[in-house]
């Protein structure tokens, strides 16, 4: 993403740090579900939630050795969780399980942000439509002048499309 053209909130959603944070959330939730099912010890899920962390630079450092993004991520998180419970991180999961789930959640976050912006934009259009309900303007049809309308009507038409 090009920073100067990116809203700060959207940039955060698609940042490398947030991608890893979201992957960690997937790993935490998976470990908690596995603990509930008796697949891993409950203490492991607690340790993964409470101690699970990472440094992006450390992930990159490990990735230069492993040439695998998920192995480097799991290894880096495991360094924080500790050797007793690190073996339970990513247990029974594939790289795609984690990456695709994280990506889907990030897309949901992005859509929520876009929808919030559209709702705000719709409110502005509604308010401005009332303000300009008597302001005349030339209507358009087939790319040429048409019957006169008001700017308020134009704004209401745009609003109805949102």
Please report, for each region that a protein language model flagged, where it lies by residue.
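A helix-coil-helix interface module used to build multimeric assemblies
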Residues: 1-161
């Amino acid at each position: 993403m090009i920073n100067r053209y990116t809203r700060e909130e959207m940039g955060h959603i698609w940042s490398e740090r947030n991608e890893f944070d979201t992957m960690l959330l997937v790993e935490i939730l998976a470990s908690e579900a596995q603990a509930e099912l008796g697949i891993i010890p409950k203490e492991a899920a607690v340790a993964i939630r409470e101690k699970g962390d990472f440094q992006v630079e450390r992930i990159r450092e490990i990735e230069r050795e492993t040439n695998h993004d998920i192995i480097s991520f799991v290894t880096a998180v495991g360094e924080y969780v500790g050797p007793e419970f690190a073996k339970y991180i990513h247990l029974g999961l594939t790289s795609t399980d984690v990456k695709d789930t994280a990506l889907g959640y990030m897309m949901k976050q992005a859509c929520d942000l876009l929808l919030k912006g559209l709702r705000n934009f719709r409110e502005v259009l509604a308010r401005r439509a009332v303000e300009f309900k008597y302001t005349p303007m030339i209507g358009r049809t087939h790319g040429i002048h048409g019957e006169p309308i008001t700017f308020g009507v134009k704004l209401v038409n745009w609003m109805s499309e949102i």
